[in-house]
Amino acid sequence: MYTRSKVVGPGLGTSSISRDHAGAGQRRELGLQQNRRQSLEVAAPEGPKMERQGHADQGSAGTYTLIAPNESRRQKIQRIAEQELADLERWKQQNRAKPVYLVPQRLGGSQSEAEVRQKQQLQQMRSKYQQKLKRDESIRIRKEAEEAKFQKMKAIQREKSNKLEEKKQLQEDIRRATFREHHQSKTAELLSRLDTERRNRSACLIAPPATQSSRWKLPVLLRDPSWAGSQAHRDSPQKEDNPRLQKTRDGHQKNKLLETKGQHQEEERAQIHQAEHWRVNNAFLDRLQGKSQPGGLEQSGGCCNMNSTDSWGL
């Protein structure tokens, strides 16, 4: 292996050393100038604006720009900072934790290990019973809430059924009153017509004797056989009028009796229908109540089978 060794002559060595000394001297001079400028800028008092601008131009002549600080603002900021630090120290002194003084007492060792284990076992056994009691209590509260809900539903259904029955009863009363008024008006009209016919016939019966005065004026009418036949024909219905009126009155009484009987039958039918409606509603509410209870399906099963055909067939 061969190594290269740098051979430096006497001329080259002296030139490099002199160059290094010259560069170090130049750097030292530049550093001294910059330090002098900085000391002049810091020590100079606040002058007019042109003087500050001249210093800024002198400072910017180097490699960087130096901005003079605002002394009033700096002092104000320092004063505020010192005041805040003093306030912080004062607050720390005021809110410092106070010493705690406790009465000395004996900690632990009052019970034996067997007693502690027995106590833990009792607490564990009681916890099981307490959980069971809590579960039963929650079930009871849920059942009470469901029962209250079903009772509310039943009350709403009863109120609706009562309103429906009242509405039906009102409509039935209005219909009966209308029918009664119509029947009375028709009966009065029939009776008035019969009375007018009877009066007309009685007037016709009374009118023939007045023809005797006109016998001298109209002798031909008495001798006319057609007039005599018509007079006899008029007299014959008058004789049959009394039995016919009696029959009409009897028929009117029979109609009244039939009407009262029909009203009684209709009232009985309405009462039966209302009782059946109440029975169906009670069966439906009993089924709802049976479903809300735990064993309600088995208890209300027979009732549902007995009432299913009659209740939904309405």
Curated annotation (Swiss-Prot):
Q: Where is the composition biased (Polar residues)?
A: 305-314
Provide the protein name: Epithelial-stromal interaction protein 1
Task: Using the record's annotations, give every residue carrying the modification Phosphoserine.
Answer: 39
Tissue expression remark: Expressed in the spleen, with expression in T cells, B cells, natural killer cells and natural killer T cells and high expression in monocytes and macrophages.
Q: What is this protein's function per UniProt?
A: Plays a role in M1 macrophage polarization and is required for the proper regulation of gene expression during M1 versus M2 macrophage differentiation. Might play a role in RELA/p65 and STAT1 phosphorylation and nuclear localization upon activation of macrophages.
Give the top-rank taxon of the lineage listed in the UniProt record for this protein. Answer: Eukaryota
Compositional bias (Basic and acidic residues): 18-30, 232-272
Q: What happens when the gene is disrupted?
A: Down-regulation of M1 macrophage marker genes, including Il12a, Il12b, Cxcl9, Cxcl10, Cxcl11, Hif1a and Il23a, and up-regulation of M2 marker genes, including Arg1, Ym1, Msr1 and Ccl17, in M1 macrophages. In bone marrow derived macrophages, impaired induction of M1 macrophage marker gene expression and impaired phosphorylation and nuclear localization of Rela/p65 and Stat1 after LPS and IFNG stimulation and enhanced M2 macrophage marker gene expression after Il4 stimulation. Reduced number of MHC class II- and F4/80-expressing cells within the population of M1 marker-expressing macrophages.
- From the UniProt entry, list the residue stretches annotated as the region Disordered: 1-72, 227-272, 289-314
Keyword match Metal-binding: no
- Coiled coil (UniProt feature): 71-180
